[in-house]
Design a protein with these regions (language model features):
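Short, cysteine-centered beta-strand-loop-beta hairpins and adjacent loop/turn segments enriched
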Residues: 100-108
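A solvent-exposed, acidic/Ser-Thr-rich amphipathic alpha-helical stretch
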Residues: 30-84, 90
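Hydrophobic/aromatic beta-strand elements that line small-molecule binding cavities or substrate pockets
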Residues: 79-85, 97-100, 112-118
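Hydrophobic alpha-helical core bundles mediating ligand binding, dimerization, or RNAP-core interactions
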Residues: 18-21, 25, 37, 41, ...
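Short, low-complexity N-terminal intrinsically disordered segments enriched in polar/charged residues
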Residues: 1-35, 39
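Detector for glycine-centered tight turns/loop "hinges" at secondary-structure junctions
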Residues: 47-49, 105, 122
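Short beta-strand edge/turn micro-motifs at domain boundaries
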Residues: 108-134
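Beta-strand residues in well-ordered beta-sheet regions across diverse protein folds
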Residues: 94-95, 127
């Protein structure tokens, strides 16, 4: 386990990135969302490892995301857990849970995930997400 001081420093680095990621996601603002990522960017979900370059995340990509979320009645998501489990000066592992909500405030689903943030090109960004969401 990392020391309390290391975890506190990692939280100062990671939480603003995760907050910005969720804000961009909820707005379906592709540019804001991408600004929180490092590329290539990876997502492991439903047994499939997805790999995206910056150029892969375009209007067609966000349209697919919007359609998929609309199909489940999604309106917004919130973080319900963010715990630093491992950290260094170049990488942070964050055990997360997020909850998806409908417009009326009812829960669509809650999913556990692991987010890996890396320090590249002078900034922290999300490099990998491993999620139990579909």
């Amino acid at each position: 386990m990392p020391s309390e001081e290391a975890v506190a420093q990692a939280r100062e680095r990671a939480i603003p990135v995760l907050d910005a990621w969720m804000t961009g996601f909820n707005a379906l603002d592709l540019q804001a969302w991408k600004a929180t990522m490092h590329f290539p960017h990876f997502r492991l979900a439903s047994g499939i490892m997805h790999r995206w370059e910056d150029a892969d995340m375009d209007d067609t990509f966000i349209a697919r995301v919007r359609t998929g979320l609309g199909n489940i009645g999604w309106h917004y998501s919130v973080w319900t857990r963010r715990e630093i489990v491992h950290c260094s000066d170049e990488k942070i592992h964050v055990d997360t849970q997020f909850t998806r909500y409908r417009e009326d405030g009812s829960v669509v689903a809650a999913h556990d995930s692991l987010y890996v943030l890396t320090y590249e090109d002078g900034r922290w960004g999300i490099k990998l997400r491993s999620s139990f969401a579909r």
